[in-house]
Amino acid sequence: RLPVFIAAAAAALAVFSYLYNPRNANMIHSLPLDRRELYITNYVSGFVFLFVPELIAFIAGVLVCLANQITCIQYLFYWFLYMAGVSFFAYALAVFVAMLTGNIFAMPSYYLAVNYLWIGCMKMVQNISSLICYGVSDTWTSSQTSRLSPLDYLIRNLVMGVKYDKDYVQAVGVTISGGKTVAVYAVAAVVITVFAYFLYKNRKIETTGDVVSIAALRPVFRWISGICGGGLIALAVSALVLEYIKVNEFISLMIFMVIFGSICFFAAEMVLQKNFRVLCKKRIAEWAGFVAVVLILLTCFRVDVFGIERKIPDASEIEAAFVNMDYPVCVSKEQIPEVLELQKQCIDSKDEYLSVY
C-alpha cells in the first residue's frame, strides 16, 4: 500500500506540476481549453500511470499461471481489483491535496499529513488525557474512525495471506480481507475527485507559489500547526521535565502548550506570509483566541468535562480485561464484573489515591 500512495503522489505532482510555477500556470490556462477539460485530461493521464502497470502485471501473472497449469487465477483478479481500488483512492486524494497548495514542496508534506492527521491527533489527545486525567492509560486503540487515516488503516486492514490445510503442510488457497474497506475508499474517491475539480475550477492563478492556495484554509493551517505542532512538542518537553523535576503535570503541560503552540502558530503565519513580520492587530487577536481555546480545552480535560475518568463500560461490551502490575494479567470472563467493581472503587477513591501518589 505504501508504494501505491507514493506513486499516486508522484503522478499527481507530475500532471499538475504547472500549478506550482507562475509562468507555466499562466501559459497552460491561456490555452483555448476550459478548466474542466484541463482537469479531466490531467486527471486521467495521471491515473493511467498507476493503472496500466497494474494491468500489465495482472495479464503477465495470468499468462505465467496458465503456462504452468495453475488454474486458481481468480486470486490474481482479486489482487487487481484491490490494487485498482486503492490506487484510485490514493490518486484522488493526492489530486485533492495538490489543489490545496501552490508550492511543490508543500504538497508531499500535506499528503503525508492528511493520511496521518486523524490518528496523530487521537494519539496526542490520548497522551494528554493520560498525563492530566486520573487513571487514564496512554494506550491508543484503533476504531472505525481510524478510516480517516487511510494509509495507516489500509496497511493494517488490507491483508492477503496463504491458507493451509489442517496440518499446515500444503497451501490450499489464499485469504484476502479488506474488500469492503477498499470499496468504501473507492466510493470516497469519487466524491474527492469531484470536490477536487471544484477547487481547481475556482483556484486563483495568483496563488501559485503559496503554501496554502485557498484563503479560507489559511486560519485552519495556523490553528492546526499551533495545536498539533505545539501539542507534540509540549508533550515531549513535559515528559522530559517531569522525569527530573517534580511539578504539577497540568500546569507544566499548560505552560508548554501555550509557549510552543504560540511559536508554531506564528511560524505557520510566517510561512504563509513569506515574511518574518507577522505581528499585527488582527493576527494578535486571533492568537489570543487560539490561546484561550487551548486553555479551555486543557481545563476541560483537567476537570473531566468529557467524562473520560468516570467512563465505565458495560460488562457486555468487554471482550477481555487485564490488570496491569509489573506485567499484564489476563482476567477470565467470569471475573469481568469484579474488575468493573474495582475500577468503580478506584474512581470513587480518586482524592485518596492522589493524596498519596
Question: Can you name each region flagged by the protein language model?
Answer:
Residues 105-118, 281-293:
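Central hydrophobic cores of alpha-helical transmembrane segments
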Residues 299-357:
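Membrane-interface segments at or immediately adjacent to transmembrane helices
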Residues 34-46:
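Membrane-interface alpha-helices at helix entry/exit sites of multi-pass transporters
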Residues 222-229, 268-308:
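Internal/C-terminal transmembrane anchor helices
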Residues 13, 44-106, 119, 127:
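Secretory targeting signals
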Residues 193-199, 235, 262-274:
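Alpha-helical transmembrane segments
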Residues 1, 116-199, 203-216, 231-254, ...:
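Terminal transmembrane helical anchor/hairpin motif
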